[in-house]
């Protein structure tokens, strides 16, 4: 809450002092909560996020929406991204979480590089094709491109502009494991564990609005996400130096 909510309030204060009125917020698909239909469309009402992270993102969306109502000359973009993965293709920058990773791709990468023995897959009895959870994975470079396009297209265009940034297709946990095994050239050890409370069986984006209005769409595949992650992790087996 301090990072997302208080940090945003401090940034808004600084922007008002500098007379800057274009704001791009990196929001999250978690603001949708549990929806009855997939894919998720921007017109869906926001739900009840399960995590403090999602709740803080929704709070910031509400703050920015109220700000724009009070000061209609502001241009605010709410970019709801789905599951960012991958790394910079140079292999110089990647995700290096401390402790056991919460996100799937770095967890797989640490198993593949030998830092962890096995990947825990939470649930193999979901109503999906292979029984594992399905998510919409997007390469971080596509996500970065989306922010740049939003900055260029929406600058000085008053209003609150909401866009999903996702691939528009779902991939299961085992799909991601198989893509990574192909990227690193060896099997990735995994085991099944009980479902985690609050995890949804499946969801993915309808990103057609971003395609239509921003001329943005993903260009990188799940295989490329795995390849770039492995490139980073294999060059930095222990992550970034302390």
Predicted regions and their residues:
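Catalytic helix-loop patch of NAD(P)-dependent Rossmann-fold dehydrogenases
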Residues: 2-10, 17, 21-22, 31-83, ...
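C-terminal substrate-binding subdomain of Rossmann-fold SDR/epimerase-dehydratase oxidoreductases
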Residues: 104-242
